[in-house]
Amino acid sequence: MNGRPDGSALVTGASRGIGAAIAKALAREGWPVGVNYRTDEDGANGVVEEITKAGGRATALQGDVADPDTADALFSALEEEFGPVLVLVNNAGVRADGLAPMIDNDDWDRVVNTNLSAAFRLTRRALRPMIRSRYGRVVNIASIVGAVRGNAGQANYAASKAGLVAMTRTVAAEVARRGVTVNAVAPGLIETDMTEGLGENLLEHVPARRAGTPDEVAECVRFLASDGAGYVTGVCLTVDGGLTA
């Protein structure tokens, strides 16, 4: 652990895609990892198996972060097995796209609750153990949609991600003196299930002329969760191949 306090890392929405890549990256750094999933048990178990085979420690944790009771349940389970959660990555997210007149209240509430409110509840639950340890890393997975720009058909998603960045900066200022950093990563076009079907329209606007990979996003999270990023807080790091340059 290189002098860090003993503890664990929790990654939400980690059964596949960006979340799975982040879980594996943190495990390579020596963190025991809680691999949270909502429905994809096989995917989460596959991530745990890969981490374990590589010499790391991990456990699969079922829970829907949209449920207000899930935060305590996830933390209690992980704390019992691996110790206090000192790295939290709020990655779980959903989309329910549609032009503003067509977004009903349920789709608005579901996206904002999962992408923003759940991240706040998990962060709130994480902060006290981190403050007691005088060490903590919170990384929120935002998006260039909302964090940097709007996108037609995604008013609910953009609002949730813009709010996530605002929350990141505010909480970062509150806990900076306690050895706790709070940052965000805003991916652009990344090869995942959530972005499938968007690539052809966007790729021609990406200066890098390619989509990013989950591993490239995970590497940014790995840095922000590291000892070397102790003076980096309140930042939103875009990972978009120059799309918003």
Language model features with spans:
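Conserved glycine-rich cofactor-binding loop
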Residues: 15-16
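Substrate-binding pocket helix/loop in short-chain dehydrogenase/reductase
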Residues: 99-100, 104-112, 202
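C-terminal substrate-recognition "lid" of short-chain dehydrogenase/reductases
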Residues: 120, 213-244
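Active-site helix of classical SDR
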Residues: 123, 160, 168
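Alpha-helical segment proximal to the catalytic Tyr-Lys
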Residues: 128, 173-174, 230
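Residue(s) in the substrate-gating loop at a strand-loop-helix junction
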Residues: 143
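Short, small/polar-rich loop/turn modules that mediate ligand/substrate recognition or access, typified
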Residues: 176, 181, 232-234
